[in-house]
Amino acid sequence: MADKMFKALLWAFATAVVMAEAVRGQLVPCYFVFGDSVFDNGNNNELDTLAKVNYSPYGIDFARGPTGRFSNGRNIPDFIAEELRISYDIPPFTRASTEQAHTGINYASGGAGLLEETSQHLGERISFEKQITNHRKMIMTAGVPPEKLKKCLYTINIGSNDYLNNYFMPAPYTTNENFSFDEYADFLIQSYRSYLKSLYVLGARKVAVFGVSKLGCTPRMIASHGGGKGCATEVNKAVEPFNKKLKDLISEFNRISVVDHAKFTFVDLFSSQNPIEYFILGFTVTDKSCCTVESGQELCAANKPVCPNRERYVYWDNVHSTEAANKVVVKAAFAGLITSPISILLLVL
């Protein structure tokens, strides 16, 4: 079983490499990023928030040190940019010039959610709705041609905080009291549909939407909802209907936008979190953080010890993944191993 899975991974990666090599140069003219801390590359540095990581040991393996990325090194958008053969940095919105709207901007913000109230206890954050507003202003001010915008890649990672920092954090939130798992998923998807429509109106035609991962298997939720002994089943059960409905939403958008040659794909982070696959890929620690996290916290303690074998860990802190895990996700997404209906590579070609 493990041998077959390993061979499948190798075959898929090799196929993706061959396809990419058939196309010369940068694969898209611009790349726009939306989402939460998983994608944030420094926007929260400028905000009054607890969700800020512009300090050591964050960035310990990043060339420029701590930048506001919630990892020890490169995050998922960084690796996506590499796969797209983009030679320049995609700047965070808070430090981007108007001219950079022609080549790409990262609007993601730690703590952001589909709901405006999500993560309000942490302080300032740029919600998904506000990120889209920022994008609209930037491309309109810069005068980016509509035909160019249709050729850009758009990636979105949003929804985790609506569970971590809302539904499963009762005070000061009431969503847990008002919605069942299925009802809450419907409520979130209703907002997601509206936001995707907004991006579509603004020219997005190549869109990769990342689902929510197995939040119950993060060190944070294992400690708070799993009794410290294993994945929090209740949390994962809550997330499942959201991912299913989000995947259905992507299918819906592909059906209604086929005339306009728009393509949407779903990146399944939930089903891909398999212990056997982790082991095959060299990860031996899947339930603990690599950095030092103080009791009751989720982010790394400043200037405290970190594990030396970071390539063996899935989690960097109590929620966010290591550079090694981020790289695997992107390779799998470009090879089509965790995407539906098409790989990110086919999305941009």
From Swiss-Prot:
The active site is at S37, D317, H320. One of its GO terms (molecular function) is hydrolase activity, acting on ester bonds. Keywords: Glycoprotein, Hydrolase, Lipid degradation, Lipid metabolism, Secreted, Signal. It is found in: Secreted. Residues 1-25 form the signal peptide. The keyword Signal applies. One of its GO terms (biological process) is lipid catabolic process. Its main location: secreted. Pfam families: Lipase_GDSL (PF00657). GO terms for cellular component: extracellular region. Its EC number is 3.1.1.-. Glycans are attached at N178. Gene3D superfamilies: SGNH hydrolase. CDD domains: SGNH_plant_lipase_like. Belongs to the 'GDSL' lipolytic enzyme family. PANTHER family: GDSL ESTERASE_LIPASE, GDSL-LIKE LIPASE/ACYLHYDROLASE-RELATED. This is GDSL esterase/lipase At2g19060.
